[in-house]
């Protein structure tokens, strides 16, 4: 089993470029974002004003207490009570605004995730087949699930904390200056130290956050791959090899994850230590000023609170930097996916062909193709197939049989030459219209989680129940379906393991029959079923192929003896063509293949 590709480097991402893309994306949500920012600012302002208001109560309490001790007055509890009620109202408003801001921001972040998932889902349908053949399923799924979730969670928390932290820093600075500029200067001395420490930690943690996200996709790919091929792994006793591969990827994920989390975790204790130093310095200087009557006791209490509040946003900004790193790492992978080159879905309007013109005539004219420029798979393929003919393509593994089908359906485009349908180049059809003309039965059957009725109806979504049942009967599938619990309403599980391989192929054939396409492609359709089921499939397909152009790709040469035309491929070229009898009589490469299979059966 091939291993998924592993990241080869831990170099730093384009952090600034990714943030610019995120900002451009957020510009589509200006109104809810602006509202969330406004309520965040209002909530923070009321919180900031709290210590200053409370200082008046503290000063009134201290003054009244001293006056009471001296016998010159008493504590004005009515005045203090009014202040506390006013303070309570401010904090209630702050909480209300914070709640509204949280509600808006949560909805906004989930809307962003929703839109990203929708864009990814639409993008998948526009990506060329080559993209998926070069990547594991787990890696693609990781971008849709892990990366989008990480992006949404980080977006929700980072924007809120960024706004409140900046607002708090500015507001607290203003309040501190209004109390004592000299004490403010002392408190500000901690800023350069704090910022320097944040920048150092961010610099070292940045590359590990990207490596963590990338390696997580690799681990997901391995888990998905091993789960899908679990039976193969156990049959070949490859558990040890698979475990070793997984451990290698898991170790790499562990290394990048613990380093990124450890470095980000250093910020809080470092910032707390620096903040406490400033707190102690302000407390000492403030007590000296109070003793000399420069400021009141209430102002000292408020200023100390502000110093504590001033260091908190710095700590929060350090956390925001970590969240931004995680968000940018996830966003970069999402944007990379969304920026992948797409297939051209629509043909040139000046030469667009009408899919109604497809009646089954297919011409390959000196087709040349390679998956990479330095590796040509098909060298010079030419052939004309008339409507209604059954064409068999045979040859050893790697001869280019399946590649011809991919070219016919424009999963890939030819490097030179052309493929035409009724004289129209396949590139003159819209891709969706072109593929609607083909019905496929693949060796790797695909059924989704749902009822048997729904799986067959996938061939034509507007088909009635009667039409679905008729298609199942034509595919010789009706009998076994009715013997299953629930019949046509039986629910298939995610990998359709509650029906046999032969039954899966009969269901896919029924789906193809229901689609009623003009051209059929049978790729190894009967290579993995028992003889009795193969006979049922062959009978159903013979009925289906009447009046339709059919391409049959098979290694069992006995299944295509009645083909109107047999194309024998070898190393990307057609070396022989003709009927079965003609090719046997010629005694060439086809005859050798046929006789070797016959000898294997006899042996």
Please annotate each region the language model reported.
Residues 28, 129-130, 148-155, 159, ...:
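An intracellular "coupling" helix at the cytosolic face of ABC transporter transmembrane type-1 domains
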Residues 346, 355-603:
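ABC-type nucleotide-binding domain
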Residues 41-49, 91-99, 151-154, 158-170, ...:
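Hydrophobic alpha-helical transmembrane bundles that constitute the permease/transmembrane domains
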Residues 64, 175-189, 259-333, 337-338:
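Helix-loop-helix
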Residues 7-15, 38-39, 46-62, 66, ...:
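Juxtamembrane helix-loop junctions of ABC transporter transmembrane domains
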Residues 28, 32-45, 157-211, 282-295, ...:
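Transmembrane helices of ABC transporter permease
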Residues 33-97, 178-182, 293-297:
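Transmembrane helix-loop-helix hairpins at lipid-water interfaces of multipass membrane proteins
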Residues 15-30, 140:
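A short amphipathic helical element positioned immediately N-terminal to and/or at the very start
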């Amino acid at each position: 089993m091939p291993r998924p590709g592993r990241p080869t480097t831990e170099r730093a991402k384009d952090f600034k470029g990714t943030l610019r893309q995120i900002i451009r994306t957020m510009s589509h949500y200006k109104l809810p974002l602006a509202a969330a920012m406004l309520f965040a600012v209002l909530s923070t302002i009321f919180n900031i004003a709290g210590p200053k208001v409370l200082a008046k109560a503290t000063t009134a309490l201290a003054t009244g207490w001293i006056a009471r001790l001296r016998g010159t007055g008493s504590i004005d509890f009515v005045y203090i009570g009014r202040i506390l009620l006013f303070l309570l109202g401010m904090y209630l408003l702050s909480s209300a605004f914070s709640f509204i801001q949280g509600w808006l921001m949560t909805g906004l972040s989930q809307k962003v995730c929703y839109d990203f998932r929708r864009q990814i889902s639409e993008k998948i349908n526009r990506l060329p087949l080559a993209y998926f053949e070069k990547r594991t399923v787990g890696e693609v799924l990781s971008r849709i699930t892990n990366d989008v979730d990480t992006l949404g969670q980080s977006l929700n928390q980072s924007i809120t904390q960024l706004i409140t932290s900046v607002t708090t820093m500015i507001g607290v600075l203003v309040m501190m200056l209004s109390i004592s500029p000299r004490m403010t200067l002392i408190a500000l001395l901690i800023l350069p130290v704090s910022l320097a420490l944040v920048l150092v930690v961010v610099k070292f943690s940045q590359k590990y956050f990207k490596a963590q996200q990338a390696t997580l996709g690799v681990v997901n790919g391995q888990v998905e791959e091993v789960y899908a091929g679990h039976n193969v792994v156990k049959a070949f006793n490859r558990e040890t090899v698979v475990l070793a591969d997984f451990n290698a990827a898991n170790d790499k994920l562990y290394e990048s994850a613990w380093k990124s989390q450890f470095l980000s975790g250093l910020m809080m204790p470092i910032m707390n230590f620096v903040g406490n130093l400033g707190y102690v310095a302000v407390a000492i200087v403030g007590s000296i000023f109070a003793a000399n009557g420069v400021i009141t006791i209430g102002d000292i209490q408020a200023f100390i609170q502000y110093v504590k509040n001033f260091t908190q946003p710095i700590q929060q900004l350090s956390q925001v930097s970590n969240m931004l790193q995680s968000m940018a790492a996830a966003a970069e992978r999402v944007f990379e996916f969304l920026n992948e080159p797409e297939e051209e879905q629509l043909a040139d309007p000046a030469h667009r062909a009408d899919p109604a013109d497809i009646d089954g005539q297919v011409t390959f004219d000196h087709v040349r193709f390679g998956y990479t420029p330095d590796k040509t798979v098909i060298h010079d393929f030419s052939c004309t197939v008339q409507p209604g003919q059954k064409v068999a393509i045979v040859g050893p593994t790697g001869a280019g049989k399946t590649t011809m089908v991919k070219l016919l359906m424009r999963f890939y485009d030819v490097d030179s030459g052309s493929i035409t349908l009724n004289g129209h180049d396949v590139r003159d059809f819209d891709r969706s219209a072109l593929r609607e003309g083909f019905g496929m039965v693949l060796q790797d059957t695909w059924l989704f989680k749902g009822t048997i009725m729904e799986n067959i109806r996938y061939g034509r979504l507007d088909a009635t129940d009667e039409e679905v049942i008729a298609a199942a009967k034509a595919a010789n599938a009706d009998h076994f379906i009715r013997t299953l619990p629930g019949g046509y309403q039986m629910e298939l599980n995610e990998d359709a393991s509650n029906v046999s391989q032969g039954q899966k192929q009969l269901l896919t054939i029924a789906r193809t029959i229901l689609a009623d396409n003009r051209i059929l492609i049978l790729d190894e359709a009967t290579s993995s079923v028992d003889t009795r089921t193969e006979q049922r499939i062959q009978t159903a397909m013979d009925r289906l192929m009447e009046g339709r152009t059919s391409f049959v790709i098979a290694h069992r040469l006995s299944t295509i003896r009645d083909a109107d035309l047999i194309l024998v491929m070898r190393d990307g070229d057609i070396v022989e063509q003709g009927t079965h009898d003609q090719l046997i009589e010629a005694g060439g490469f086809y005859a050798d293949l046929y006789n070797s299979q016959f000898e294997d059966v006899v042996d």
